[in-house]
Amino acid sequence: MQENISHLDQIAQTDIYLLDQIMKGRYNATDKILDAGCGEGRNMHWFLQNDFEIYGTDINEAAIAQLKSANPDLTAESLPVAPLEKLPFADNYCNHIISSAVLHFAKNTKHFKAMLTEMVRVLKPNGSLFIRMTSDIGIENKVKLISDGVYIIPDGSKRFLLTKTLLTECMQENNLSFLEPFKTVNVDDLRCMSTLVLQKN
């Protein structure tokens, strides 16, 4: 029973769609993984508990400090405070990058593209890029554009939204392809969350 509780603790806060990738064997213990926009590390916990080489970066200094406090074995080099558009990692450094509920805070289309392009730069060829973010897919007629790429969505919040046109454009510009079918969950017509699992070609 205690062992089962321990396993549940490892995955309690992990994005359910990231868990799907974990269970499918997407990630190997020899891979370098980056959680881009990691916050306090909710999606890093399983990897840390299972001895993966995982890195995290976030612009929020307090969140990184909390993550370091909870995981004292992690070095400053593995948890830099940095914006996604200026990642302090070499080209082709990581086998996999995770970005969950981050990109919809882009200020505009240029900012979104800068963050995406920077993640692709750090990703190795044939590496995977996992993205979860809000989109307009399924609620196209219920969102209100207020600035370049930023909308008010039916739940009242302001988000940068991924559109099919933008997705196609970005995939072509960054030489990306789908590893899995594109998925979108409509939450009672209040917001739509899309999941992308992409490969750098």
Explain the meaning of each model-derived region.
Residues H96-K110:
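A short SAM/SAH-binding and catalytic strip from SAM-dependent methyltransferases
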Residues C94, H111, L167:
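Residue-level recognition of oxygen-bearing side chains
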Residues E85-I97:
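A short acidic, Gly/Pro-enriched loop at the edge of an enzyme's catalytic core
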Residues E61, T109-K113:
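Non-membrane alpha-helical structural segments and their capping/turn regions in soluble enzymes
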Residues L103, M115, S135:
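Flexible, active-site-proximal loop/turn residues at the rims of small-molecule/cofactor binding pockets
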Residues K113-P125:
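A short glycine-rich, Lys/Arg-flanked "PGG" loop and its adjoining helix->strand segment in the class I
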Residues M1-T75, P80-E85, S128-N201:
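Class I (Rossmann-like) S-adenosyl-L-methionine-dependent methyltransferase catalytic domain
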